[in-house]
């Protein structure tokens, strides 16, 4: 079953979701909406990407629309989500990637244009959050607006699930060493709510807040209140890494922990949690579609109950792939209920 998908917001994640969809057999992007980009510029931005390279295919402009690999993609420029005529193209599932409409009420506006479901590509204050491989099986089709959580939660949650299921996490602290993103500054500038966040991204390591660890408690209720974390924004353009330091109830050697993670990466979490013993660095993970790539040689343990685990993630590519995997999954659940 091919699912027809629309994208609202053709920024960083919107475009990377589009590129990933080309490799996703059961996803067809039929429409894009962005009020700030004209079709010719959208085609240019999709064709050329500093981080992920040139688009491997054909991109043309036909009037006000795009033609990608010979298939027409309707291009809208509506500012109000409620005004986007998604039903014209049959787009049933909408990726809400503007970063603006992140609540159930705001994202629900897409339903007025004929969409059936909205997937927010960011954490949401009130929409149910799903992380593939962790709690996606709890989706029952009742919610019209859902969230794919954050890229960091998608990296941390599968790892935390494996550790908790096998050894029981008593408590833990997470640090994500995170590449800079579009919200940061190219030169020092005003940032009233976060003074440090206003400093030049390419020249500083910037301590920052993140709700990613606490959000794990929403997708793994048993870990609610047991994890928290922070971020260090660093001068790299893409790829980030999670450092999870946890106290576990059931003692285990580091080798035993590695074996459990390796087994999960080859079994139930294949494609979501990956495992490597190579001497990798961040750029080696650019374009990796996994949510979380466990680095077996980077972790350490103090004793059998206190361990530090390290896992990489392409915060653009891997996250965008999960957005599409989530749509593919929920569309099958929805079809059974129809």
UniProtKB/Swiss-Prot annotation:
The record marks 178 as: Activates thiol group during catalysis. Pathway: Carbohydrate degradation; glycolysis; pyruvate from D-glyceraldehyde 3-phosphate: step 1/5. Its main location: cytoplasm. This is Glyceraldehyde-3-phosphate dehydrogenase. The keyword NAD applies. It comes from the Eukaryota. It is an enzyme of class 1 (oxidoreductase). NAD(+) binds at residues 12-13, 34, 79, 315. SMART domains: Gp_dh_N (SM00846). It comes from Neurospora crassa (strain ATCC 24698 / 74-OR23-1A / CBS 708.71 / DSM 1257 / FGSC 987). Keywords: Cytoplasm, Glycolysis, NAD, Oxidoreductase. GO terms for biological process: glucose metabolic process; glycolytic process. It is found in: Cytoplasm. GO terms for molecular function: glyceraldehyde-3-phosphate dehydrogenase (NAD+) (phosphorylating) activity; NAD binding; NADP binding. The lineage of its organism: Eukaryota, Fungi, Dikarya, Ascomycota, Pezizomycotina. It catalyses: D-glyceraldehyde 3-phosphate + phosphate + NAD(+) = (2R)-3-phospho-glyceroyl phosphate + NADH + H(+). InterPro entries: GlycerAld/Erythrose_P_DH (IPR020831), GlycerAld_3-P_DH_AS (IPR020830), GlycerAld_3-P_DH_cat (IPR020829), GlycerAld_3-P_DH_NAD(P)-bd (IPR020828), Glyceraldehyde-3-P_DH_1 (IPR006424), NAD(P)-bd_dom_sf (IPR036291). One of its GO terms (cellular component) is cytosol. The gene is gpd-1. Its EC number is 1.2.1.12. Homotetramer. The active site is at residue 151. Belongs to the glyceraldehyde-3-phosphate dehydrogenase family. Pfam families: Gp_dh_C, Gp_dh_N. D-glyceraldehyde 3-phosphate binds at residues 150-152, 181, 210-211, 233.
């Amino acid at each position: 079953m091919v699912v027809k998908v629309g994208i609202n917001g053709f920024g960083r994640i919107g475009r990377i979701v589009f590129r990933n969809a080309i490799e996703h057999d059961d996803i067809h992007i039929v429409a894009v909406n962005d009020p700030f980009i004209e079709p010719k510029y959208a085609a240019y931005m999709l064709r050329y990407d500093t981080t992920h390279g040139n688009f491997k295919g054909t991109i043309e402009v036909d009037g006000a629309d795009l033609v990608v690999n010979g298939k027409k993609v309707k291009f809208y420029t509506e500012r109000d989500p409620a005004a986007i005529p998604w039903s014209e193209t049959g787009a049933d599932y909408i990726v809400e990637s503007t970063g603006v409409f992140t609540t159930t009420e705001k994202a629900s506006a897409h339903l007025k244009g004929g969409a059936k479901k909205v997937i927010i590509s960011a954490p949401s204050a009130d929409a149910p959050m799903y992380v593939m491989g962790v709690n996606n099986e709890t989706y029952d089709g009742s919610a019209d607006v859902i969230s794919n959580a954050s890229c960091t939660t998608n990296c941390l949650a599968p790892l935390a699930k494996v550790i908790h299921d096998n050894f029981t996490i008593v408590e833990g602290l997470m640090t994500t060493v995170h590449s800079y993103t579009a919200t940061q500054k190219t030169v020092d500038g005003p940032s009233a709510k976060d003074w440090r966040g206003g400093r030049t991204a390419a020249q500083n390591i910037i301590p920052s807040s993140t709700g990613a660890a606490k959000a794990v408690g929403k997708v793994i209720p048993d870990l609610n209140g047991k994890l928290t974390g922070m971020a260090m924004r660093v001068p790299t353009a893409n790829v980030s890494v999670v450092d999870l330091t946890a106290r576990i109830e059931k003692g285990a050697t580091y080798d035993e922990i590695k074996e459990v993670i390796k087994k999960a990466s080859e079994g139930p979490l294949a494609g979501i949690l990956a495992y490597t013993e190579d001497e990798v660095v961040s750029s080696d993970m650019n374009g990796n579609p996994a949510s979380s790539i466990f680095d077996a040689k980077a972790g350490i343990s103090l004793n059998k109950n206190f361990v530090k685990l390290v896992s990489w993630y392409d915060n653009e590519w891997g996250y965008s792939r999960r957005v599409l995997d989530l749509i593919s999954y929920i569309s099958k659940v929805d079809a059974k209920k129809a």
